[in-house]
Amino acid sequence: MAQLDHRVFAAHPLAVRINQQYYVRAIQQVHPDLSLSFYCAVENGIVLTAMTPGPMLPNLQSLFEGLQERLGDLLLTIGCDCFLRRLELEDDGSLDQIGGFLREQRVMGFNTYGEQFNGMHINQTFTGVAIARGRAPGHR
């Protein structure tokens, strides 16, 4: 049980499915009686699905391309990135690559122990507020 730590939990996330969307419910610790504590609410009897993390860079590139398209030139993004994602990046050796990409996108922020999105507490995500110049009149 000693080897079950944050790095193992980050590499093997669990998620709850709500309306065709999956929301990660990160394990915080395993207790001596083998019960689990999570970083956010998990109701008794809820069905959790084992997830497989994918590469973060293509996902972040797609996210920022979409933001540019919708908002125009990004001036600053205030980012909240779950610390479990950081552990994942450290373990797979891509921390510098992702850090460089986020710097190029003018992201400033910090690592968190959970994020709020659409009124829901979630884990192992990147959330933020993007500030842009805006699009020319007539663009959506």
Language-model-detected regions and their locations in the chain:
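Small-residue-enriched flexible segments
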Residues: M1-Q105, T112-R140
